């Protein structure tokens, strides 16, 4: 059985990590390269960089950053945010990103999923889905959760797999940033609809929440602030999960 993965997410703006971190032993906690290296050294399984600037003129900064990160870390890393076309996705992968995460662009042009998958393999395509319940149904939202697409989550999950995605990054809009726990109802809803790995996102606040996400059917759990502010220690989290019967990678912990 594949090990469950713990993923740290970094919001990057103009080549710097924003939303703050609390690592006293880092010279510069705003440097994504240094922070990425640090996370890879303490046992985080994967990194996600979200480019929240995501404008054309700032793209060069992100490309240079991806190259630097690729040289420094030895864990998979995904880049998302503002990837609107095949050219941008392609350039990020060629510069060293292991995967790209697409969201709004995939909804507006689903053929983009297929193009990236055919060129670089399904494993390089993560489709990020932001969803919440509307009138009793899980519905897909785009533009950072602002636009209700009217597309039902169940239909989009099936199409995403059919189009060639390798993974789904499932974010509960209602849980994001609350630290109230992952939306296990949504994870359980999506699990039987797809064979793709599901990354749970939105709501991590304590170690039990990771366990709940995995028990609900998630293959990976993503978090940001609980790691950045050291509210949860990666070693303790993995040992806790192992103790509760979850298969996690313990190599590389420190």
UniProtKB/Swiss-Prot annotation:
It is found in: Cytoplasm. Its EC number is 4.3.2.10. Its main location: cytoplasm. Coiled coil: none annotated. Keywords: Amino-acid biosynthesis, Cytoplasm, Histidine biosynthesis, Lyase. Pathway: Amino-acid biosynthesis; L-histidine biosynthesis; L-histidine from 5-phospho-alpha-D-ribose 1-diphosphate: step 5/9. Heterodimer of HisH and HisF. IGPS catalyzes the conversion of PRFAR and glutamine to IGP, AICAR and glutamate. The HisF subunit catalyzes the cyclization activity that produces IGP and AICAR from PRFAR using the ammonia provided by the HisH subunit. This is Imidazole glycerol phosphate synthase subunit HisF. It comes from Thermotoga petrophila (strain ATCC BAA-488 / DSM 13995 / JCM 10881 / RKU-1). The lineage of its organism: Bacteria, Thermotogati, Thermotogota, Thermotogae, Thermotogales.
């Amino acid at each position: 059985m594949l090990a469950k993965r713990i993923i740290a997410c970094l919001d990057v703006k103009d080549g710097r990590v924003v939303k703050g971190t609390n690592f006293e032993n880092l010279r510069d906690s705003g440097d994504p390269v240094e922070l990425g290296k640090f996370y890879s050294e303490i046992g985080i399984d994967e990194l996600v960089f979200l480019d929240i600037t995501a404008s054309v003129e700032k793209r060069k900064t992100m490309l240079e950053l991806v190259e630097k990160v690729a040289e420094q870390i030895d864990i998979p890393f995904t880049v998302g945010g503002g990837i609107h076309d095949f050219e941008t996705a392609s350039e990020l992968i060629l510069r060293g990103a292991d995967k790209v995460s697409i969201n709004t662009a995939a909804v507006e042009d689903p053929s983009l999923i297929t193009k990236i998958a055919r060129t670089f393999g399904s494993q390089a395509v993560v489709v990020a889905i932001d969803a919440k319940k509307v009138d009793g149904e899980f519905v897909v939202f785009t533009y950072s959760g602002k636009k209700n697409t009217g597309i039902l989550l169940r239909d989009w999950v099936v199409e995403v797999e059919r189009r060639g995605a390798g993974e789904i990054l499932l974010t509960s809009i209602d849980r994001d940033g609350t630290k109230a726990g992952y939306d296990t109802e949504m994870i359980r809803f999506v699990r039987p609809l797809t064979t793709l790995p599901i990354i749970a996102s939105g709501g991590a606040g304590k170690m039990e929440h990771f366990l709940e996400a995995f028990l609900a059917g998630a293959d990976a759990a993503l978090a940001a602030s609980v790691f950045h502010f050291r509210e949860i220690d990666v070693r303790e989290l993995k040992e806790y999960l192992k103790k509760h019967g979850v298969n996690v990678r313990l190599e590389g912990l420190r």
